[in-house]
Amino acid sequence: DVTVLGVEESHFDLDYYGAPGVQVVPTMQGTDATVAATAYVTAPAGCTVHFAITNRNGDPVAEADADAANAKTNIKIENAHLWHGTEDPYLYTLTVTLLQNGKAVDEIATRFGCRSFAIDPQKGFILNGKPYPLRGVSRHQDRPGIGNALTAKEHTEDMDLICELGANTIRLAHYQHSQTFYDLCDERGMVVWAEIPYISRHMPGGKANTISQMTELICQNSNHPSIVAVSYTHLRAHETSLHL
C-alpha cells in the first residue's frame, strides 16, 4: 500500500523515527488508568493540541488540551476497561487534533489498550495481575510469489490460522512487520514479541544501524498493547557476550 500525505506547515511530525506522531502510555492505578499522551509537532508556534479519548463504541471518555510546543498531558480513565489478551482485547482510541487560531490543521488517531504485565520465574507471564500462560507461534511476513509485500488479505489469513491453532502469543521474526498485522494483534488479543534483523553474529560496523533500527521499532510500535517485548537476539549462538 502507498499513502500520500499533504500537510500544512504546522503538522504532526512525520519524521520522528517513522512513528505515528503521538505516543500513548497507559498506567494502571487500581481500577483507573492514567494515560500519558505526547504529541510531536512540527512548527508548533501559535498552535494548541486537543486530546480526546473515546471507547470502543465511539463514545467520549475523557479529553485534555496542551500547548503544541510541549504537547504532553495526563488523562484519567475511571474504571478503565482492560485489554486482556484473547479473552477481552478491548481498545480505546485517542484522537489528537492540532489547532491553529481555532482551526483544525491536522489530526491523527491511534488505538491503545489499558493493561499491565509482568514476567515471573515461577508464575510465568502475568497479565493484569493474573497468570496468563503463553502458547504461540513464530511468524514470518512472507508468501510464495509475493515475498514480503503482503496485503491485508494475507495478513488476515495468517492471523486466522494462528487463532485457529489456539495460540495467544506471536514472535514476529525477525524484522519490522506491517502495521496492519500489529493492528490485528491488538484486535485479536495476541501477546507479541517483536524483533529487529540482528542475526547470528555481531558486526562492529553495524552498531549504529542496530541502535537506529531498535529505536524505530520501539517508537513505531509503542502504542500497540499487544507488544510486551522487543528483542535483538535472533540466533545469538556464536558469541558469548555482546555490548551495544
Feature names for model-found ranges:
Residues 210-224:
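An active-site-proximal structural segment forming one wall of the substrate-binding cleft
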Residues 181, 217, 233:
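Aromatic/hydrophobic pocket-lining residues that form π-stacking "cages" and hydrophobic walls in ligand
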Residues 196-201:
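Short, acidic/turn-prone active-site loops that include or flank metal/cofactor-
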Residues 222-232:
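Catalytic-core segments of hydrolase enzymes
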Residues 1-184, 189-192, 213, 228-229, ...:
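Secreted/periplasmic carbohydrate-active enzymes, especially glycoside hydrolases
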Residues 233-240:
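Conserved small/polar residues in nucleotide/adenosyl-binding loops
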Residues 202-212:
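Active-site-adjacent "subsite" loops/lids of carbohydrate-active enzymes
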